[in-house]
């Protein structure tokens, strides 16, 4: 695909264990995050993935060889699914990291508008708070909170990236192939666990996502014109 990848600050990933909350924009960014955390930082990532990915034979086989959790997003037993997410973090060793994509799906403009409209109907105050989002989707807090609560001793890392936008469909990937040389940038922001409120994690996550959105905007502007 002619992809050039810059990981700005992998040093903040060490030491582990960690819980990582990552932006999700494409079919490729989860693979790149695994490469950054595994090959560069020397950590062992385990992912919360949607169960639909089990239809991919490679992900089904490899995904089950690793301690990942395939989330059933249509389950009637939400508490059971959240318990499975929390369990992914409960036995993290010093070089382990658990990863979730709080947006729950690959972000694009149409999804963002649709989700904000639905949020306006259910929770107007939160919708107004998250209305400034221009790059990310409103985060779904339940899974992220479960993952963090499963490892209450772990610092949390917010993972951002740019350059993968437009790769959320196979058509988008083909267009990037035609462009040839594409640069992607990934960065991490580590937050000490004592700085994370235990009683208002959902509100904290919204604030972190608003901050990440501004970071993504700034990095996207910086990336323009870079060849």
Enumerate the predicted regions with their spans.
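A structural micro-motif
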Residues: 3, 43-45, 154
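A Trp-anchored, charged/polar loop motif used as the substrate-binding/catalytic surface
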Residues: 78-90
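Membrane-anchoring hydrophobic helices of lipid-metabolizing enzymes
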Residues: 1-19, 24, 32
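Conserved phosphate-coordination/catalytic loops
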Residues: 75, 79, 137-138
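Accessory terminal regions of nucleic-acid processing enzymes
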Residues: 195-227
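Catalytic core of membrane glycerolipid acyltransferases/transacylases, capturing the structured
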Residues: 18-77
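A cross-family acyltransferase "interaction/gating" segment
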Residues: 51-66, 93-199
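Short acidic-hydrophobic, aromatic-tinged amphipathic segments that line or gate anion-handling sites
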Residues: 7, 69-73, 190-192
């Amino acid at each position: 695909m002619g992809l050039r990848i810059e990981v700005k600050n992998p040093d903040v990933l060490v030491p582990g264990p960690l819980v990582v909350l990552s932006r999700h924009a494409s079919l490729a960014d989860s693979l790149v995050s695994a490469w950054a955390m595994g090959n560069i930082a020397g950590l062992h990532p385990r992912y919360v993935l949607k169960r639909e990915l089990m239809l991919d034979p490679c992900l089904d086989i490899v995904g089950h060889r690793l301690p990942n959790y395939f989330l059933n997003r249509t389950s009637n037993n939400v508490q059971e699914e959240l318990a499975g997410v929390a369990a992914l973090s409960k036995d993290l060793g010093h070089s382990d990291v658990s990863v979730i994509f709080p947006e729950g799906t690959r972000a694009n403009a149409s999804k963002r508008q649709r989700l904000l409209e639905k949020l306006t109907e259910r929770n107007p105050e939160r919708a107004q708070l998250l209305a400034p989002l221009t790059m990310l989707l409103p985060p779904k807090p339940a899974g992220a909170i479960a993952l963090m609560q499963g490892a209450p001793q772990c610092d949390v890392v917010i993972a951002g990236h740019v350059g993968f936008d437009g790769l959320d469909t196979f058509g988008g990937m083909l267009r990037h192939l035609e462009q040839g040389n594409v640069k992607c940038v990934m960065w991490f922001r580590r937050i000490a666990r004592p700085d994370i409120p235990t009683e208002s994690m959902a509100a904290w996550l919204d604030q972190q996502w608003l901050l990440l959105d501004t970071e993504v905007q700034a990095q996207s502007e910086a990336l323009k014109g870079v060849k």
